[in-house]
A protein has these predicted regions:
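Actinobacteria-biased recognition of intrinsically disordered, low-complexity terminal regions
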Residues: 145-155
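A short, structured loop/turn motif at beta-sheet edges
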Residues: 10-14, 41-42, 66-71, 90-99
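Beta-strand/loop substructures that line and gate deep hydrophobic ligand-binding cavities in soluble
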Residues: 77-131, 147
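Short, cysteine-centered beta-strand-loop-beta hairpins and adjacent loop/turn segments enriched
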Residues: 53-59, 108-112
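Helix-adjacent hinge/juxtasegments
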Residues: 59-66, 74-77
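Short, surface-exposed coil-to-beta transition loops
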Residues: 2-4, 58-62, 83-88
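Short beta-strand segments that buttress and anchor functional surface loops
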Residues: 46-53, 74-80
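Hydrophobic ligand-binding cavity/cleft-lining segments
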Residues: 1-43, 138, 153-155
């Protein structure tokens, strides 16, 4: 099952990549989710866990970074019982900033039952992801950035 959402962000691609790959800070903009990272820095092999919880029900989504290409792309492999597959975060330059895309290629559990279940929740999941990406864009756009010309002052 493939799912992908994109958002335009009025910030340099490097700033967008820095924000989306700050795993623990994803807890601030990914709806209903808290992310923890095992020590090791940003690199292939790094492990992290996202716990998503809504109305007291939740699941853990352990992941491993499988591709690390700053400031453009990072891939993770989902290793959990509920979520398995590949997530891809990409940042592309755009006029006035960058495009950020979050794609998931997931192997749904429980065969036909899992596919049917996801078909039911997909609209809500998509809405949650879109809102999360808009929140990310607002956060990144509101961060002070150095002025062009190297003055060190922020705008």
């Amino acid at each position: 099952m493939h799912l992908e959402e994109r958002v335009a962000i009025a910030a340099p691609p490097a700033a967008v990549f820095e924000a989306v790959s700050d795993w623990e800070a994803q807890s601030e903009w990914v709806a209903f989710t808290t992310v923890t990272v095992e020590p090791g820095g940003h690199r292939v092999g790094e492990r992290l866990t996202a716990v998503t919880r809504l109305a007291g029900v939740g699941f853990a989504d352990p992941m491993e970074v499988t591709r690390w290409e700053p400031p453009h792309r990072v891939d993770v492999r989902h290793l959990g019982r509920v979520v398995r597959g590949t997530g891809t975060l990409t940042v592309e330059p755009a006029p006035g900033g960058a495009w950020f895309a979050w794609a998931e290629d997931l192997d749904l559990p429980l065969g036909a039952v899992g596919r049917l279940g996801f078909a039911v929740i997909r609209p809500a999941f998509t809405l949650m992801l879109r809102r999360s990406l808009r929140k990310l864009a607002r956060q990144v756009e509101s961060r002070p950035r150095p002025r062009p010309g190297g003055t060190g002052r922020v705008r």
